[in-house]
């Protein structure tokens, strides 16, 4: 059997791996002020090296860092966009119970609001990608959350009308932020980018569709809107970058 030399590969994985106990405990200590940022980074580095080895040992060609740098798969990225604010616990009715052994983990979805003009202040995942690339022999795959997540749970009501009287300007600036991040990742050597978007699946769920209507959005129109937004984000990617 021949194997692809260039992404996308026949066998792929999302790449968000279960955090090892050492990393979970270290993050808890960091949140409680008992561990420095530098010490946490060292533990993350070690756990990422182990995750990379595991993926390589089973024959994966596209290697991720397990998203071990993040507390939440999307919020840690999106909160670094200037003008975006993370708000948690706004929808108790939509709280989800996660299936841990005791079934006692429940949390409301994270929402995002736009408080001012959007700006890409710095490379968000660039340094993380560079570390991953330095510790794998295979193709490093970088995952970023979809831009649609900034809009999905809050809609027009979550976008400051002084900053953005017109939603078209908001979406244009949001796409520009992602283009800048993607350009910096490309400059760092990224040739395999994954954009994680759960909202297309959510829009197949009747309850989620009703929630979209409650915030004044049309669930039948959002798929095309979000597809156009993502296409705007990736339109300037280099020819050798697979998305």
Regions found by a protein language model. Give the residues of each.
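Domain-level signal for soluble alpha/beta catalytic cores
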Residues: 1-243
